[in-house]
């Protein structure tokens, strides 16, 4: 890529700067990503390899590593990565569309049971995508979650290198 997609001007290649991947709706930092900057029009691009694997790794990370109740942006990310509309997720979980909407916009906190169910659904989806019938990690993940969890106001950002989603998905859910 030598020319800007927007204006056709020469672009500057950036390889040593972390990329804040906020397009997914979460606070994710990708290291080792080639970025492009057009000084002429100000347009910025990033070259992110294998988005499907990246999103799967982020989803599995949320389900297995985040011990607090799911945050609104995490619920929305999981739903979108499941390729579900809010109406479809609501039907799957046995709640109303307005409940899913309130979870996703932060007006209502997701309950413990629905949090666990959404994580379970996502992990089974990730497992099916990896050609496994049942993901053994789901039960272990639920066992590791405390019965009562506190809300975390300021979570740490997730920092990832391409090797983590290109080569090293958890054994439970390789893509």
Tell what function each PLM region has.
Residues 120-175:
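Long C-terminal interaction/binding lobes of large macromolecular proteins
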């Amino acid at each position: 890529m030598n020319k800007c997609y927007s204006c056709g001007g020469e672009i500057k290649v950036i390889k040593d700067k972390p990329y804040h991947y906020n397009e997914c709706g979460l606070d994710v930092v990708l290291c080792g990503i080639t970025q492009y900057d057009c000084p002429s029009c100000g347009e910025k691009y990033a070259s992110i390899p294998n988005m499907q694997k990246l999103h799967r790794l982020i989803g599995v990370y949320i389900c297995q590593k985040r011990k607090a109740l799911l945050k609104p942006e995490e619920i929305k990310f999981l739903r979108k990565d499941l390729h579900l509309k809010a109406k479809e997720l609501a039907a799957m979980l046995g709640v109303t569309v307005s409940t899913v909407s309130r979870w996703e916009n932060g007006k209502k906190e997701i309950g413990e049971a629905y949090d666990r169910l959404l994580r379970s659904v996502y992990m089974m989806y990730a497992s099916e995508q990896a050609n496994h019938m049942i993901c053994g990690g789901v039960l272990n993940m639920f066992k590791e979650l405390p019965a009562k969890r506190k809300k975390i106001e300021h979570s740490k950002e997730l920092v990832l290198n391409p090797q983590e989603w290109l080569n090293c998905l958890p054994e439970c859910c390789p893509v």
